[in-house]
Amino acid sequence: MKHLDSLEAESIHILRETAAQFRKPVLMYSIGKDSSVLLHLARKAFYPSRPPFPFLHIDTTWKFHEMIAFRDKRVAEEGVDLIVHTNRAGVEAGVSPFTHGAAYTDIMKTQALREALTQGGFDGVIGGARRDEEKSRAKERVFSFRDAHHRWDPKNQRPELWNTYNGRVGKGESVRVFPLSNWTELDIWLYILRESIPVVPLYLAKPRPVVERDGALIMVDDNRLPLEPGETPQTRWVRFRTLGCYPLTGAIESRAASLPEIIAEMLVARTSERQGRLIDQDQAASMEMKKQEGYF
């Protein structure tokens, strides 16, 4: 596991650099496996003290119930300072994945994130994105510069030579920091197993009620999911490789009910973990355009 030690050391170095270079850093906590690893690394980086920055969760009100329960449990256990932000204007306008299509992600995620960062005055924003996840993230720097409107310009980024990071920003500007940039999905699971890091149970396979819609298995998490004509929820063995808003996150059929079984599945996987994210499939270069508008 020597490569895990190397990845861990690099991530801890990046977290400490962030705390040292920025006036007001924050860690984006999306509750998934990468966020769980980030929380663990942040505790290690500043032990025995608690992380010297708050955690931020953008709550769209459409997360899986198990995710919210897990979030509240872990925050209470670790004693971290958690900020939960929701786009109240979007909620009051009745914005949902079913009524607003692609605009839902912009309103409830991107606009909500920009709003939270502006209100908080955060200049160093730590996230759990990895380069192996998606092609636009593959070309992103560890310290990824954002302008005063939180927008990302892939052609206006700083060189990162010899693990030296430049966190200088002007008024209103910020930097997104990605300590897990060089990790792979398999690395994440190997580290979770080695360090006994708790994760949301949705990552583990078990019988769950799902409907098959447009080639994706959508879990019926509550009664807000409108069933289309001819749809009937079926109980199938499924799990999730990635987690987001439940109407926009497809499950995969699996019997991997333990961490070793998930890792065994990863070793033969030939598809991206984000294949289940319906928001990535609305148009070509979708993620890059979202990021340029301020998305995670």
UniProtKB/Swiss-Prot annotation:
InterPro entries: PAPS_reduct_dom, Rossmann-like_a/b/a_fold, SO4_adenylTrfase_ssu, Sulfate_adenylyltrnsfr_sub2
Record-level Gene Ontology MF annotations: ATP binding; sulfate adenylyltransferase (ATP) activity
Enzyme nomenclature, EC number: 2.7.7.4
Pathway: Sulfur metabolism; hydrogen sulfide biosynthesis; sulfite from sulfate: step 1/3
Enzyme class of the recorded protein, top EC level: transferase
Reactions it catalyzes: sulfate + ATP + H(+) = adenosine 5'-phosphosulfate + diphosphate
GO biological process: hydrogen sulfide biosynthetic process; sulfate assimilation
UniProt keyword Nucleotide-binding present: yes
Coiled-coil portions: none
Claim: Transferase is one of the keywords in the record: yes
Function summary: With CysN forms the ATP sulfurylase (ATPS) that catalyzes the adenylation of sulfate producing adenosine 5'-phosphosulfate (APS) and diphosphate, the first enzymatic step in sulfur assimilation pathway. APS synthesis involves the formation of a high-energy phosphoric-sulfuric acid anhydride bond driven by GTP hydrolysis by CysN coupled to ATP hydrolysis by CysD.
Record text on subunit structure and interactions: Heterodimer composed of CysD, the smaller subunit, and CysN.
Protein name in the entry: Sulfate adenylyltransferase subunit 2
